[in-house]
Amino acid sequence: MWSLLTIFFLQFANKAGSDIVCLSPTALEMREERGIAIDSLDYAVSPLYLDSISHLGAEVLHTSRWFNGATVEANEQTIQAIKQCTFVDTIYLTRTDEESSVIPPLSLRKREVIIGEGQEAKGERLEAKGEGLKQLVQLNLLPLHQAGYKGQGIRVGIADGGFYNADSLESLPHDQWLGYTDLTDDKEDIFGQTGNHGSLCLTAIVAHKEISDGTLAGTFTYSGTATEASYYLFKTEEHATESPKEIDNWVAAIEMADSLGLHIVSTSLGYTTFDQEHFNFAYADMNGCTSRGAQASLIAARKGMLLVTAMGNEGNKTWQYLSTPADADSILSVGAVNKDGAIATFSSYGPSADGRVKPEVCAMGEGTSLISPANNTVITSNGTSFACPLIAGMAASLWSALPQATNMEIREMIIRSCDKYSQPHEQYGYGIPNTWEAYTMATTDLPNTKHQTPYTKIIHNGQLYILHEGKRYNVLGCRL
């Protein structure tokens, strides 16, 4: 017998009685500027259907207009009654109560949210060596910042698991904070001591700090990659469980980002295996089409957003490959390198299961400088989690310099500026982008954004392999 903690995703047959377009004035303006038409995916889920399943005893946790459904909590009696509803097309189990009763062992949890702050005590000394700008230098981002483009006018979302002290951290520009939403069951203070992973990722984008050793010559700067961008925070990670329900939380965040008119969403999360093995993905599922997260990523791209997603830290583990939603098409998945540009051994491998180059880009994810939300000092940590926001902020700065560009034009310029663009690699992808080159490229040769996979070669263990052309997808992320 199922308990009230069993969670399902219900997919409805249609949107009868729905006449609400779920887009803010800001989002509508963005759509108009970019010529993106309103379609059925922009309309809310039928309120009639939501009322009906609520009256049957289900608790609606959140809805999905893109997938025309709702994530609900229900017991067996309620779900049997819902099965009789003609407007319910499909029912998916996403979490059972067995995995809610105890926090699973750390080894079974997402590696992406495991961070290390072992160098926190050395933070200020690291800055004295000029470490605070190293990750910007590697991306050749400083010339764009010096030209005055630091993400102003660009709205960035961060989807993560906790934002400890992000509401008060001195190094963050709080006047640029747009708001936050908790899409989890935790319903705890997202700024409390329930996780700082999101805060660390946020500092890589918007934090700014001047550091001095007491002399004029000893003044140094920590800077994020888009210190003038506005930002919105989404908590999508459940602390006690690892289940597909978290993917539904994330999809809800991406849909909300679209409704708010955000330009970019940075996601340092990934999914491969879960607390209950029958939910697990296989590598074959990392095809940009199987998970709702990957499908939602493609829809977001069609709606004008640029999603930037961490590849994962499985390169030296049994899984080895990328996670979802990093497998999605039309996004930027991000691998990790060190300060010398060498690939981090933990950075997950591509390509996607259907042969597309993954990751698209790399940034510093080994020894990344961040601001500690605990005490506002500069620390270093490792993970594609921290390479990801560097690229998200870089894209925001580039977009602020080219405000008329589309999301796919920004994506393509970034990819084409990479140092391995002509010979992508299974861990580097197209390599490390050159921001200034991407910017200057736009003034001379705006890229053909329809050419999403310009090369079908990849280097594996020093050998050259020829890949088949990546599949194309329709707006729902289904393979054509």
Where are these regions (language model features)?
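Structural recognition of the beta-strand scaffold that forms the well-ordered cores
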Residues: 19-22, 62, 69-73, 92, ...
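Residue-level detector of functionally pivotal "anchor" positions at catalytic/ligand-binding pockets or at interdomain
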Residues: 439-471, 479-480
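Subtilisin-like serine protease catalytic core
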Residues: 90, 143-181, 185-246, 260-263, ...
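N-terminal domain-start motif of subtilase-like serine proteases
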Residues: 10-12, 61-62, 78-79, 103-158, ...
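Inhibitory N-terminal propeptides of secreted protease zymogens
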Residues: 8-108
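Substrate-binding/access-modulating region of protease and related hydrolase catalytic domains
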Residues: 145, 151-152, 168, 233-330, ...
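Hydrolase catalytic cores
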Residues: 236-237, 321, 365-428
